[in-house]
C-alpha cells in the first residue's frame, strides 16, 4: 500500500476520494438505536463527507429476531416529528423478522435499526454520517441521553413504505458503491474456488464461518471473522477449505438512466428506468407501421429525446 497507494484499489475506485467501503460485524445484544443516513449530495453539503448506503447479511439470529426497515405506511414530516416527540415512532416502523442468511439492502434515506440477538455482517460506504432518530430513552456513561439528530433525519428520510429487498441477482447486493457475492465451500463436494483480481477492482473477502487457505502469490490461512484484502491486479487467486464468506468488489459506475423501447405493430412504448429498475417516466405512441422504417425510427428517436428533455436528463446520462 505504501508503494502503490490508491492503485491497489483499482481503476473503478478512482471516482472515490477515500477507501470506498467499510466491512464490519455487529453483534447486537440489545435493540440498537433507530437511525438514518443521508445520501451523498446532502452529506457532502452538510457534513463534508459522503453519505451511506449499506448492506446487512444476517450471520446469526435468535428465534424472535427482527430488524426495523422503513415505515409500515407513508408518514408526513409532521407526523414523523410528532411520533419522535411522543415516543410512538416504533408503531409506524416496519419490523422485519429475520433468520440466518437473510439480506437487507439499506439505501441512504432508509430509516432502520438492528434488533437484539442478531449478528450482522455489514458492507457499507466508507462514511461515518449517522442521524440518530430514537434511542429508547437510554443514557450514556455520563448519565445523559445520547444526542438525537431529528431535524436532519426528517430532512433526509424516505417516508414511504419500502419493498423488503430489491433483487440484485446473481449478486447478494449490487450498487455503485459495492458488489457483494456469497461464497459457500462445504469442504466436501465444493472445497475450492478460483477467481481473478483484475486491474479494475480489489477483492475483499469477509469470512463468516469456517477455515482454510487463500492463495494469491502467497498462502494465507483464514478462520471465522477474518477479513482479507487482495489488491487490484493481483491476478489469479484460490480459496480452499470449508467456509461461508462475502466477497466484495467495486464495479464501474452504472449509467444513472436507461431507455427501454418496445416497438409493436400498433403501439410503441418508451420508458425511463433508474439503476434500481424504478420506472421514472413512460409514454405510449401509435407506431403507424405502414410508414417507411426510417420515419418510424425518427419518430421513436424524437419521442425518446422529448421524454429525456421533460425529465431534465441528458443523453450522456443514459
Please report, for each region that a protein language model flagged, where it lies by residue.
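Active-site region of the double-stranded beta-helix
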Residues: 1-100, 110, 114-211, 215-216, ...
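Glycine-rich, mobile lid/loop segments that gate access to catalytic sites or pores
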Residues: 103
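Residues on the solvent-exposed faces and adjacent turns
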Residues: 187, 232, 241
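Structural motif
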Residues: 211-213, 234-236, 267
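Low-complexity, intrinsically disordered Gly/Pro/Thr-rich segments
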Residues: 224-237
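Short glycine-rich, Thr/Ser-proximal phosphate-binding strand/loop in the N-terminal lobe
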Residues: 257-298, 302, 306-309
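Short beta-strand-loop/turn "lid" adjacent to the catalytic site in phosphate-handling enzymes
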Residues: 309-318
Amino acid at each position: 500500500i505504501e508503494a502503490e497507494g490508491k492503485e491497489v484499489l483499482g481503476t473503478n475506485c478512482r471516482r472515490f476520494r477515500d477507501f470506498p467501503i467499510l466491512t464490519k460485524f455487529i453483534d447486537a445484544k440489545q435493540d440498537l438505536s433507530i437511525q438514518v443516513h443521508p445520501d451523498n449530495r446532502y452529506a457532502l453539503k452538510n457534513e463534508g463527507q459522503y453519505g451511506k448506503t449499506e448492506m446487512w447479511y444476517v450471520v446469526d439470529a435468535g428465534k424472535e429476531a427482527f430488524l426495523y426497515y422503513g415505515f409500515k405506511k407513508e408518514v408526513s414530516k409532521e407526523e414523523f416529528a410528532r411520533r419522535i416527540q411522543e415516543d410512538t415512532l416504533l408503531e409506524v416502523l416496519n419490523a422485519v423478522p429475520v433468520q440466518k442468511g437473510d439480506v437487507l439492502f439499506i439505501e441512504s434515506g432508509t430509516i432502520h435499526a438492528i434488533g437484539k440477538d442478531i449478528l450482522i455482517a455489514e458492507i457499507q460506504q466508507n462514511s461515518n454520517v449517522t442521524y440518530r432518530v430514537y434511542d429508547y430513552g437510554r443514557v450514556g456513561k455520563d448519565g445523559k441521553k445520547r444526542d438525537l439528530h431529528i431535524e436532519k433525519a426528517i430532512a433526509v428520510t424516505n417516508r414511504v413504505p419500502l419493498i423488503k429487498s430489491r433483487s440484485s441477482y446473481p449478486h447478494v447486493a449490487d450498487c455503485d458503491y459495492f458488489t457483494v457475492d456469497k461464497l459457500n465451500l462445504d469442504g466436501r463436494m465444493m472445497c475450492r474456488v478460483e477467481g481473478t483480481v483484475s486491474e479494475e477492482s480489489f477483492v475483499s473477502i469477509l469470512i463468516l464461518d469456517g477455515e482454510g487457505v487463500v492463495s494469491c502469490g502467497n498462502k494465507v490461512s483464514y478462520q471465522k471473522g477474518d477479513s482479507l484484502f487482495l489488491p487490484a491486479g493481483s491476478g489469479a487467486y484460490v480459496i480452499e477449505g470449508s467456509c461461508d464468506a462475502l466477497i466484495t468488489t467495486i464495479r464501474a459506475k452504472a449509467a444513472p438512466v436507461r431507455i427501454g423501447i418496445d416497438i409493436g405493430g400498433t403501439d410503441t412504448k418508451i420508458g425511463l428506468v433508474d439503476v434500481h429498475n424504478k420506472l421514472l417516466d413512460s409514454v405510449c405512441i401509435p407506431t403507424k407501421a405502414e410508414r417507411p422504417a426510417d420515419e418510424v425510427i425518427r419518430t421513436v428517436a424524437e419521442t425518446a429525446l422529448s421524454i429525456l428533455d421533460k425529465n431534465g436528463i441528458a443523453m450522456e446520462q443514459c
